[in-house]
């Protein structure tokens, strides 16, 4: 009977220990890798850090980048920000929103752009607002231009015998619809739009790169062409040739960080502690399965 009670007690203690260790591990992962829910802000904010914000893919919205910029702007432990750019461009308005936000942040802390494979068009628009631009010799950048591509399918429609009835209020409401060819007035309107946006692009790059490239020189190459990183450096479109870690060093120097800086990426937002626990548990299971799979793959095959 005593042995039975001892076994039950021992099992209970072991279960408690497992629960406690799991809790501590989850909590440590929580503070290390994920964003803290409300109530924990300010805890463990230490050291001189550099915030890394990825800008990837086609730029169609500014929301995520703006949110990350604001977070890093407010964190006192973040001394500088690096935008890790790998984007061929996108739409102009989101680029302008990000450009304006970087202008504000630069009054408080330095912002550096690190171009990986490509940082062209709207992505270069964003980069031009930073304190420094770092890229590799073979990176693709520049492409200061505006393009509108409007398919004209009216001949196809006529060929297959489809009639398109247009009801509109406003003479140019169906401009660029593709179901009819552009007339001269419509083409002039669209050209005027593209030219205006192009001038906005050029003007902002001139402002962002002030003192680094002459306006006349910039205008002469702001014709939509793209450049290698090395050519862009020679022209004054970027500041230095280097990789991601070189950009971090530049940011650290500008931010007054001595020694090896600690880097921080945007954290994933958790709606509840349960979400955090479930995510941590699922990651542990996946890692366990990966380990088991590796062990099996390395095992000798019977012959």
Question: What spans do the regions from the language model cover?
Answer:
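N-terminal organellar transit peptides
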Residues: 1-113, 117-119, 130-136, 149-303
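Short gly/pro/ser/thr-enriched loop/turn and capping motifs at secondary-structure boundaries
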Residues: 118-122, 140-144
